Amino acid sequence: MQFYELNSSRMDYRELSADDLDLLTPLLRSEETMQTLGGALSYEQTLDWLVDTLRRYQTEGCGWQLALDKPTGVPAALCGLTYEQVGAERVLTANCIVRHELRGIGVGRECIAACLLYAFESMHADEVSAFVQKDDLAGLHTAVACRMQPTEKVSHIAFGKTAPCVRCVVRNPHLAEKAEAENEPSEDKKSTET
């Protein structure tokens, strides 16, 4: 059962299944790919991560997805929307892990843009956050390219490891447009003012 669907020009996205453990190896179990997230996961950690992702589909209606290169069908990235607890606040986050050999060609930006589009148009989210590890300049560039603004430095737990991160946030652009439209005087009001 597909809980939610992302779309973009170069990638096909699909939810993970219990049968996808082997497809996660070039992503989560790769030292190069996971270097900014504290290193490769073990088999057991990868299995736990997959189980947590499957649980999130059921309980949150969203979670990580596999991004497949359209021409080749090769896994290019993991991305998706998850809910994270930040203090007393529950925030929707956009996440992306790009295979190391595919970095620098816009895969991360395309994945995050697809996540944001879904969050704002289908989930009607007010805002989306991303937690970028402080040493991950490529991740920060991707967030900023997707109009996310760095807002604060936080300690964030990812893959069982706490790391210093920058929280980046983007507000739903549709809400800003709606607020502007509500604040503009109507034509009737304009004509009575003159």
Per-segment meaning from a language model:
Residues 1-35, 68-194:
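Acyl-donor (CoA/ACP) binding surface of acyl/acetyltransferases
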Residues 40-41, 62, 89, 159:
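Sparse recognition of residues in long alpha-helices and their boundaries
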Residues 43-46:
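Short amphipathic alpha-helix in the helical subdomain of ABC transporter nucleotide-binding domains
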Residues 50:
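Short amphipathic alpha-helical/adjacent loop interface patches that line ligand
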Residues 53-66:
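A short helix-loop-beta-strand connector motif used in the catalytic cores of GNAT acetyltransferases and
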